[in-house]
Amino acid sequence: MARADTGRGLLVLTFCLLSARGELPLPQETTVKLSCDEGPLQVILGPEQAVVLDCTLGATAAGPPTRVTWSKDGDTVLEHENLHLLPNGSLWLSSPLEQEDSDDEEALRIWKVTEGSYSCLAHSPLGVVASQVAVVKLATLEDFSLHPESQIVEENGTARFECHTKGLPAPIITWEKDQVTVPEESRLITLPNGVLQILDVQDSDAGSYRCVATNSARQRFSQEASLTVALRGSLEATRGQDVVIVAAPENTTVVSGQSVVMECVASADPTPFVSWVRQDGKPISTDVIVLGRTNLLIASAQPRHSGVYVCRANKPRTRDFATAAAELRVLAAPAISQAPEALSRTRASTARFVCRASGEPRPALHWLHDGIPLRPNGRVKVQGGGGSLVITQIGLQDAGYYQCVAENSAGTACAAAPLAVVVREGLPSAPTRVTATPLSSSSVLVAWERPELHSEQIIGFSLHYQKARGVDNVEYQFAVNNDTTELQVRDLEPNTDYEFYVVAYSQLGASRTSSPALVHTLDDVPSAAPQLTLSSPNPSDIRVAWLPLPSSLSNGQVLKYKIEYGLGKEDQVFSTEVPGNETQLTLNSLQPNKVYRVRISAGTGAGYGVPSQWMQHRTPGVHNQSHVPFAPAELKVRAKMESLVVSWQPPPHPTQISGYKLYWREVGTEEEADGDRPPGGRGDQAWDVGPVRLKKKVKQYELTQLVPGRLYEVKLVAFNKHEDGYAAVWKGKTEKAPTPDLPIQRGPPLPPAHVHAESNSSTSIWLRWKKPDFTTVKIVNYTVRFGPWGLRNASLVTYYTSSGEDILIGGLKPFTKYEFAVQSHGVDMDGPFGSVVERSTLPDRPSTPPSDLRLSPLTPSTVRLHWCPPTEPNGEIVEYLILYSNNHTQPEHQWTLLTTEGNIFSAEVHGLESDTRYFFKMGARTEVGPGPFSRLQDVITLQKTFSDSLDVHAVTGIIVGVCLGLLCLLACMCAGLRRSSHREALPGLSSSGTPGNPALYTRARLGPPSVPAAHELESLVHPRPQDWSPPPSDVEDKAEVHSLMGGSVSDCRGHSKRKISWAQAGGPNWAGSWAGCELPQGSGPRPALTRALLPPAGTGQTLLLQALVYDAIKSNGRKKPSPACRNQVEAEVIVHSDFGASKGCPDLHLQDLEPEEPLTAETLPSTSGAVDLSQGADWLGRELGGCQPTTSGPERLTCLPEAASASCSCSDLQPSTAIEEAPGKSCQPKALCPLTVSPSLPRAPVSSAQVP
């Protein structure tokens, strides 16, 4: 039941909306009253219907009209079979019996003469009032312009059918399924714009659908379209589909009170959520309802509903979304907010009517006097944008009704007010016998006779004059004393018609105006010379062409022209005269390749005016004429105030030219005075601007941004593939700017003010402006010029016309700066473009993938990528996306995704399998979202070599052998010490480090005391690129093992350094592990170690070696110490997994391990800071457990933070850490994430002994 009520409610709502628009068919006969009110009225006549138009202007006219006249489309109404004038002044109209598409010619004629715009004039004693317009249309219904289309929709999806047709009145759209009206269900949504939406599609919805349009004229059926329902998930196109807006809202303009539907249908898998917001952030009005699930319905649109509405569709459980925006513009018909008031004025006084109107867009105002449009003249002025009407020197002819009519695109409104002219008794009559006699081209003598009645009461006269022709003429007046009846008027324009009249004044008031006197001022010599154009059709001729002078410069009728010419450097000048109706002359029998000077002057009946400036031209040479084009013919230039319009005709043999070159320059004051600068025949002088290259088909070009009243020279040459041709030259002045002190004609409108551009989307920009703050003309529309910023190609500039004060410009490129300029247009005149406003469109997803993707294998597990940015990024690239897989048939979400920053253009992908084919594709992402991926590219990784395939067991064997050799070496050293009992221990050495205790030592060759020793055990932490250094030389590639009193430990720093030392039995328990330590710097002998103990560089097994050495030492330490070996035995093992990673200790020395002579007490320095390892782990834990600085100076011990054993994640390389930017390329290198060290492998502690 609720569903049925919803369907009926929509039909009732549609009926009410049509009633509000005045588009419902009328009953059999209806009366429509026409008055001075809002309009126009729209009357639609259906079949067999009639209407009576009643001219009800009695209230306005202060009584019933004495006479009513009707007009149709501005002409007098003629009666016919379907139109009759009734005795009461009303008009009866009926619709013809035949339809519009009938074959009866008579019916078609009656149909055409019936439709039109009807208005009436009501005549009364006070004046005439014009009614509003009634537009009469006959009901029609056109064929469908859009038929529904068949479609396949999955279950629970959304189906949408659409049809379009036009008719009067607007047809009601219904839908049928299998030729039966669709049931009234909430799932079936019928929109007024001819759309049927079927939500949650079911199997029962399958069938044939058609659209039915019905109005008072007829009923029409559309073509049928089938709906096929498929199983959910069976359509591959919709499986996992991203969110897409299937039906987006459209920009809509409606009149206030009409309904509007903002439709939005989205599709995705799963079904998306749809929401609406206003772009300006304001809340959506509460009277806006949701029709169906995703559509907005505004039943009665008001100006407050205007704005941009954004539909957003979100895919559930994802961040994918799509948006669509549309502007709703609600127009408001004009309404008179301040009507003019009735006035009563005495003769010769001033009347002022004020009218104000509101509406959207802002209405334009014009005035009627007794039903006739009022044209401003000298006495009647329209001010304030049409809102004020001022009438001076009121006469009886000015009495009547004045109507203020406001008009915009939504309708009209009017208000009327009468003007009564009061004539007092005893006023003088009008002056008589007014005459105007021309004295010269600029002066007229006006005379009159005194009035016949009450002449003795006259205290003075007023003389009024204005131009007799043209519109918007300014009226001038002079006050004249009573003692004279004539006046000489000066400063008139030559060859111009003027109208004069006189008014007499007494103490009681003014008389009527006298009869006008017309006069034509005398001719004068022309105030300027025609502007010349010179060209040579052959070597011995010069064609001279000019344009006729305008009437403002000719000062009369031009009767003749005089052309003077001669060689450039000779005094002899020839002249010839031609009639005034000629505009060109050919000078014959001239010398080839010579410079001639030419000038022209125009003559009227008063004589010749000033001649033009000398203009020089070189005739072509007689040789090599086959390749040199002649000058263009008939070069004409029409001068404007700030531009020159250049037009021409092709030269002889136009097929031989490739185009034209146009030059122009401003002639300086000195040049203008002497005019002796030779122009040259083929471009041998410098020009301010040019050349502008034009195609051969172009025959007109306008030079803009010129200075008014300046002398310019223009040169046009034709060129071909060989060279430039001969020039056609013109010299003349632009029009002068109007002088503010003199009476001027109304100038062009000013550019709009407050031009503002606002980005609307990635492809559209809103441009808004306001009417000029001051203008003397009525602005009818505007032109918007726009193009990409900094554009030099004029063919890419676009122009739009707008009647309002804003426009939405679409079809733009994303993330592109555009420049805009707006121009105002008056009636028959165009204003200049205003200042340029710049604005960029919003960014969007990239339209193209990264370009020039190149792949190259580096190692069996590494591939390097190089690419270039997308050709159409549509914004700033913030991230590049790399997808790769060894199986290109896998779904895209199963590929490995790597990301890198937007300013990097190369990368390395690690962790790949050797000798495997990988497929790569790349995409780019802006802040809006990702763009498309590139096409697939494949690469095969390298095969593993022998060194690459060396297994861990072989490496382990090598390391075990090295360790065993090291243990044997130490055992031999201990045995040798026991057999050397005859040697005496050095005083001052003991296990406790106190002087006087005996000690044993091996002979060792002391190294340079000034070079520090560096002994490191590298961890698996990858060296940072900035810590890289080249491998040491052979001399530096050695380590030393010193005697019992080991040398100092170097101050090598780095997070990857590890150090190990051990002593005889009773060695300490190893305590903890450290990321690295900074040990005291010292000097002294270094322990030596043979190179055989060093593992191969780059084996990557340092951590395993560390564990093996540690286990061997630990097992040796379990033996019970011998009393004979109580002295400290110390050695350091140096193992580098990569010598190139050692940066702090580049000067390592490797010395042979052979017996040396024992050191004496005198040669061996006393120890300082030597540690007895027999004290066990307690001492070591006490000294190193905190890893905090305990001393200062040379014996400090500083540990770096224990960070190597902690896990590390590189968030900037998520979701995979297998990528490293290649150093040395455009990518900036990044430090790789250090690998985690297993806690099950112990780390060797560090012992320190220093000999100061």
Swiss-Prot record:
Domain Ig-like intervals: 27-136, 142-228, 241-329, 334-420
As given in the record, the signal peptide range reads 1-22
Q: What is its main location?
A: membrane
Q: Where can this protein be found? A: Cell membrane
Segments in the Extracellular topological domain: 23-956
Q: How does it sit in the membrane?
A: Single-pass type I membrane protein
Keyword tags: Cell membrane, Disulfide bond, Glycoprotein, Immunoglobulin domain, Membrane, Phosphoprotein, Repeat, Signal, Transmembrane, Transmembrane helix
Please give the residues the UniProt entry marks as glycosylated.
N88, N251
Membrane-spanning parts: 957-977
* Family named by the database record: Belongs to the immunoglobulin superfamily. DCC family.
Protein known as: Immunoglobulin superfamily DCC subclass member 4
Encoded by which gene? Igdcc4
